[in-house]
Regions:
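Alpha-helical transmembrane signal-anchor/signal-peptide segments
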Residues: 17-34
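Hydrophobic membrane-insertion alpha-helices, especially the h-region
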Residues: 1-14
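Short extracytoplasmic
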Residues: 31-61
């Protein structure tokens, strides 16, 4: 009996300060505001459309924050769709990535997974003490039959997991979904979509440019909510 009580007491002490869905509410409110306030426009990029999110996607993902913007760069003669979606529970993101979602809407995956790549962006580029952030990503190529010709797109995709950083693969999201310490803070998926006719090098430039503009958001989405250096960490139970 004494041993049972000791085990129970130890479990209680170990878990009573663990994050929960309720304690993470302030964190998700902060993330939603950050996503909604994000400005990716630069001197060369302007928002030309904000397409609505299909109700089916809303129901499946149950997003806490979602932003979709179509941007145009006249200097490059390029256009891109920039999407950020963040869920409250990592498990809601575990099955949602391009090879699963796009074929359900008539897109055909053109090839097997390509090796993940990465770009490096500067944080606080105007500062003399500017640091850098590595953004890994996976490139997916899809085509959709149509008349008079088929459509082709390229998707630059990755995930942000609080406390675990930026990752290019769905397996990392699934592993995070198994961790009750990470699960209440959810996960985010970021996609940059360009026309399939855009050269790979130009597509990479477009992706890097938009990630540079999104640096503060990427840091917010990937830092550990339990390790915020000042004040009380967002979402930590008291």
């Amino acid at each position: 009996m004494t041993l049972t009580l000791a085990v129970f007491a130890g479990f209680f002490v170990a878990t009573r300060n663990q994050p929960t869905a309720e304690s993470a509410v302030p964190y998700h409110a902060h993330v939603a505001k950050t996503v909604n306030d994000l400005s990716v426009e630069s001197s060369d990029w302007v928002v030309i459309d904000r397409p609505p999110v299909p109700p089916s996607a809303q129901q499946l993902l149950r997003p806490n924050a979602l932003s979709a913007r179509v941007l145009r760069n006249e200097k490059l003669g390029a256009q891109a769709t920039f999407i950020v979606v963040q869920c409250r529970d990592t498990r809601d993101m575990a099955g949602h990535y391009p090879p699963n979602c796009y074929p359900a809407h008539g897109w055909k995956w053109q090839m097997q997974p390509e090796p993940s790549e990465q770009v490096t962006i500067k944080l606080n580029p105007a500062s003399q003490q500017s640091s850098t952030l590595t953004v890994p990503y996976q490139l997916y190529r899809f085509r959709q039959p149509g008349f008079p010709k088929e459509r082709q797109i390229k998707i630059y995709s990755f995930f942000a997991i609080p406390g675990r950083g930026l990752v290019p693969d769905i397996d990392s999201v699934r592993k995070a979904a198994e961790d009750y310490r990470v699960r209440p803070y959810g996960a985010a998926q970021i996609q940059v979509i360009v026309d399939g006719g855009v050269a790979d090098e130009q597509g990479r430039t477009i992706f890097a440019d938009l990630m540079q503009a999104s640096g503060p958001l990427l840091m917010e989405l990937s830092q550990d909510p339990l390790q915020v250096p000042t004040g009380n960490p967002i979402g930590v139970p008291q």
